[in-house]
Curated annotation (Swiss-Prot):
This is DNA repair and recombination protein RAD54. Its EC number is 3.6.4.12. Residues 1-22, 188-238, 302-321 are annotated as: Disordered. Its main location: nucleus. The lineage of its organism: Eukaryota, Fungi, Dikarya, Ascomycota, Saccharomycotina. CDD domains: DEXHc_RAD54A, SF2_C_SNF. Keywords: ATP-binding, DNA damage, DNA repair, DNA-binding, Helicase, Hydrolase, Metal-binding, Nucleotide-binding, Nucleus, Phosphoprotein, Zinc. Residues 188-220, 306-315 have a biased composition (Basic and acidic residues). The keyword Nucleus applies. A motif (Nuclear localization signal) lies at residues 21-25, 41-45. Induction: Expression increases in late G1 phase compared to other phases of the cell cycle. Changing residue 341 to R: Complete loss of ability to support homology search. ATP binds at residues 335-342.
């Protein structure tokens, strides 16, 4: 069968297969000229209808000569259709019905005008009216002025993001109770500064131009000047007036009623009552509600103290106070370790990023500054509490970032984060270490940061440090400091923290030292007079009244409801005979004598470090450098000198290592507990690690040599219940802050630190959220040595901290400043020198406790249980009960959480 041949080209509308016309048809010029020259004729002129006019061919007309013709379209004649009513009377036989129905009936027909004469005026009014867009059924339902330019955005009335009337809703801000919120907009301040700079620069340019023009002989007229009137005398409106005000201008902004702010329900379900209270406090501080109440109270107190004071002076002082504290929307979260400061700050940050009293978010960006070891921990916490893919942070740990791939440098990532605005902000939270931020702070210039969280904020204790200066230069009015120990050494450090979070709150540094620091310290001294004590207490009360509005402090006692019991012990250890002999030789050496006499060139810190190392183990010393005559030392014959190749550690020459060896053996053989061993010296960790290898104990170690990326993996491996490692060696300097080691329920701190905050941070690693077992914590202190002097100094600092932060005014004045200078004296005839300084009335002369304290206060060891060597047998800890058979422990303080 032959196949049908398809056409070589498709049909083009002219005909199937017909070639289209290639040459256009010529224009008939003559026809166009005739049409244009022809006189105009009114198409609807009133004329009489002729007898044959207007007739339309009917069906009968289509029959000619007995045959039917092809039907044609009806022929219509328009002449005579527009007639008067009088002329419309004619014989119905002459005009068919179809002619009557084809009469003109539009708006201009004479027939309709004859029926309604008022129609003409309506037509004229319609033609003269201004043109409008012919939209059928359009009704203007708004009162906005119709101006040139883009269509204005209609701002809807704000509404709360979450239902405040829900049964489990946690309302942070209620406008009916808290009043209107004064939001400090830093972006407007920057715009004002930029506009001032632009105005100043333009004025300078104008002055330069005027000087140039004055020097010329013929002054030229300024070109491009905006004339006040147009040529017709009408005022020449500027373009801004023609286009209307900007929708972001202050005059054009609509003032809506504030709406409640509610915590996200997914966070409200997991927050504990004390954490809800903390989030409320943080929100009121960073939104200015607390500052507003404080300024109102200050103004009221100023007027009520001296009614006769002139109004101008009172107004000046009030304005000065308000100016100093304008925009200082910060606070200090000083909860003790383990109370969930991280979760509370995440709830605050998430609320500010999502909600506000006007229905939109209050902040666009947030910076979290923390130690380098906690950068990844913060990122994990965000995912843990908010859920995956909810909020993507930019975590910068100093070497690489999570932005822009592997080729992006840290500086480029921070710069890109700072430049992002509006919808380009895909990672609103920057998590960065203190060191990295200090090096790259220039990248954050002109960047408006809504909130700054300074974790472990006691790093800002020095107001003159580079870290403090770098963070203070960032444009951020809302600053929150997280620190479990705000007072570490003195009130000056406390002032530095408050001046960072709330600049101007306590005046200048000199004013703070004069008004608060000096009177309080004089009153706290054991040798203070009654007048100094009274003045110190008055200033302490005044300081506490001010700072209590901007600092929140809760103790670990709250955790008793949620965590297992904690048993904390301060173990006073007797030195071994070899340690005692070497210690006496060191304190009698020429180096130590120079330190005691204050001779120039002496090194007190070096001498203190040598004595502290000896208290741990003699192998930590270098005998050649640290003893005057090494040959006079009477060392045992079997003693292995430092640097020997012996595989074992001679624990019998160190009391601390002897106790540690017995502790580890009991834990390994009688329980499934895990233990954390912490020291300030990596050399001590080396000896412990050597002992663990010899005993075949599986252990992991975290110190300053480990990279930041590997630390969190190591912590996760140790916390795994199925893991084989039961010993975690930790350097207090490298990982004492923020690391959660809840896989272990026992902890030993081998040596004390001068700073009580460092020890408190280290001791809080195991008793935290997620802990399932009872915790046992031990602090080793060598009896009668420099370590006990350090512990006494810590007690004085903790006493100072409790007075200012915890508002405990009844802490006993324990030590004189002169007693703390006697560091290099060893007390041979004591079981616990610290206990003797307490003058404890609950114990007899042998140190046996006769009655317990009414209540135990964690920061006050005078209220703890006091255990002499015989009392160890009755403790509920099987490790300490076993030590009753040995003479290494002379005394112990015991704290029980609940």
């Amino acid at each position: 069968m032959a196949r049908r041949r398809l056409p070589d080209r498709p049909p083009n509308g002219i005909g199937a297969g017909e070639r289209p016309r290639l040459v256009p048809r010529p224009i008939n010029v003559q026809d166009s000229v005739n049409r244009l020259t022809k006189p105009f004729r009114v198409p609807y002129k009133n004329t009489h209808i002729p007898p044959a006019a207007g007739r339309i061919a009917t069906g009968s007309d289509n029959i000619v000569g007995g045959r039917s013709l092809r039907k044609r379209s009806a022929t219509v004649c328009y002449s005579g259709l527009d007639i008067n009513a009088d002329e419309a009377e004619y014989n119905s036989q002459d005009i068919s019905f179809s002619q009557l129905t084809k009469r003109r009936k539009d708006a201009l027909s004479a027939q309709r005008l004859a029926k309604d004469p008022t129609r003409l005026s309506h037509i004229q009014y319609t033609l003269r009216r201004s043109f409008t867009v012919p939209i059928k059924g359009y009704v203007q339902r708004h009162s906005l002025p119709l101006t040139l330019g883009m269509k204005k955005k209609i701002t809807p009335e704000p509404r709360p993001l979450h239902d405040p009337t829900d049964e489990f809703a946690i309302v942070l801000y209620d406008p009916s109770v808290d009043g209107e919120m004064i939001v400090h907009d830093t972006s407007m301040d920057n715009k004002e500064e930029e506009s001032k700079k632009m105005i100043k620069s333009t004025q300078e340019k104008d002055n330069i131009n005027k000087e140039k023009n004055s020097q010329e002989e013929r002054p030229t007229q300024r070109i491009g000047r905006h004339p006040a009137l147009m040529t017709n005398g009408v005022r020449n409106k500027p373009l801004r007036e023609l286009l209307g005000d900007s929708e972001n201008s202050a005059e054009n902004k609509k003032k809506f009623a504030s709406v409640p702010v509610v915590i996200d329900p997914k966070l409200a379900k997991i927050l504990r009552p004390h954490q809800v209270e903390g989030v409320r406090f943080l929100y009121r501080c960073v939104t200015g509600l607390v500052m507003k109440d404080y300024l109102e109270a200050e103004a009221f107190n100023t007027s009520s103290e001296d009614p006769l004071k002139s109004d101008e002076k009172a107004l000046t002082e009030s304005q000065k106070t308000e100016q100093n504290n304008r925009g200082a929307y910060g606070c200090i979260m000083a909860d003790e370790m383990g109370l969930g400061k991280t979760l509370q700050c995440i709830a605050l940050m998430w609320t500010l990023l999502r909600q506000g009293p006007q229905g939109k978010r209050l902040i666009d960006k947030c910076i979290i500054v923390c130690p380098s070891s906690l950068v990844n921990n913060w990122a994990n916490e965000l995912i843990k509490w908010l859920g995956p893919n909810t909020l993507t942070p930019l975590a910068v740990d100093g070497k690489k970032s999570s932005m822009g791939g592997g080729n992006t440098t840290v500086s480029q990532a921070i710069h890109a984060w700072a430049q992002a605005q509006g919808r380009n902000i895909v990672k609103p939270v920057l998590i960065i270490s203190y060191e990295t931020l200090r090096r790259n702070v220039d990248q954050l210039k002109n960047c408006n940061v809504g909130l700054m969280l300074a974790d472990e904020g006691h790093r800002l204790k020095n107001g003159d440090s580079l870290t403090f200066t770098a963070l203070d230069s960032i444009s951020c009015p809302r600053r929150v400091i997280l620190s479990g120990t705000p007072i570490q050494n003195d009130l000056s450090e406390y002032f530095a923290l408050l001046s960072f979070s709330n600049p101007g709150l306590l005046g200048s540094r000199a004013e703070f030292r004069k008004n608060f620091e000096n009177p309080i310290l004089r009153g706290r001294d054991a040798d203070a007079t009654d007048k100094e004590i009274t003045k110190g207490e008055a200033q302490l009360q005044k300081l506490s009244t001010i700072v209590s509005k901007f600092i929140i402090r809760r103790t670990n006692d709250i955790l008793a409801k949620y965590l297992p019991c904690k048993y904390e012990h301060v173990i006073f250890v007797n030195l071994k005979p070899l340690q005692n002999e070497l210690y006496n030789k060191l304190i009698k050496s020429r180096e130590v004598k120079k330190v005691v006499k204050g001779v120039g060139g002496s090194q007190p810190l070096r001498a203190i470090g040598i004595l502290k190392k000896l208290c741990n183990h003699p192998n930590l010393l270098n005998f050649e450098d640290e003893f005057d005559d090494e040959d006079d030392l009477e060392l045992p014959d079997d003693y292995n000198m430092p640097g020997s190749k012996a595989r074992d550690v001679q624990t019998k020459y160190s009391a601390k290592f002897s106790i540690l060896e017995r502790f580890l053996h009991k834990i390994k053989t009688e329980s499934d507990d895990k233990i954390v061993l912490i020291s300030n010296y990596t050399q001590t960790l080396d000896l412990i690690e050597k002992m663990c290898r010899y005993k075949h104990y599986s252990a992991v170690r975290l110190d300053g040599t480990m990279s930041i990326n590997k630390r969190q993996k190591l912590v996760d491996r140790f916390n795994d219940p199925e893991g084989q490692e039961f010993i975690f060696l930790l350097s207090s300097k490298a990982g004492g802050c923020g690391i959660n080691l809840i896989g272990a329920n026992r902890l030993i701190l081998m040596d004390p630190d001068w700073n009580p905050a460092a020890d408190q941070q280290a001791l809080a690693r195991v008793w935290r959220d997620g802990q399932k077992k009872d915790c046992f914590i031990y602090r080793f202190i060598s009896t009668g040595t420099i370590e006990e002097k350090i512990f006494q100094r810590q007690s004085m600092k903790m006493s100072l901290s409790s007075c200012v932060v915890d508002a405990k005014e009844d802490v006993e004045r324990l030590f004189s400043s002169d007693n703390l200078r006697q560091l290099f004296q060893k007390n041979e005839n004591t079981i616990c020198e610290t206990h003797e300084t307490y003058h404890c009335k609950r114990c007899n002369a042998q140190g046996k406790q006769l009655k317990r304290a009414p209540a135990m206060l964690y920061g006050d060891a005078t209220t703890w249980n006091h255990l002499n060597h015989d009392a160890l047998e009755k403790t509920n800890d099987h490790l300490l009960k076993n030590e009753h058979h040995y003479n290494d422990i002379s005394f112990a303080f015991q704290y029980i959480s609940h």
